[in-house]
């Protein structure tokens, strides 16, 4: 966190900046941040803010940054504060002041909301795939132990004899409910947040539908 204002006589303590910096954990969202910026640049080109040449230069710079991070050749610094600033700073280093033009019609709040939603969408799908694999394994175990009898417990005491396969399928049903919850969660995060700006929108004629379409 930095002090964005003119009423302060000096900058914030370095300890405060280190404590508030999110770059240490939000750097995992670099792919989402870059994808969002590429889509935003294409939208800015469509509405006439960026020329074709400018958009291509920005996109190529962002692709280069992603490749650097993918290959472990990108160094993150606490002074960058967050992934958005780190990417923007490197972009300006690569292509000059044009990199700052990418921020037109978009605030940090926009980027945070978008990156988190895109990251969650990806992780929800990953978790669903892993959960389905686990459910398949449970079914296999249940089918191969159809005749195995085990004690069923209630109140920590043995109560009735049950089939081990039924016991395993109980976990299958629990995970099936979890899949339903994940699908509902996906619907809730699959919403386009861009366009609000810092608070109540912007005077630029942003095409939110195009950006949403580009991002899937």
PLM regions: where:
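A helix-coil-helix interface module used to build multimeric assemblies
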Residues: 1-201, 205-214
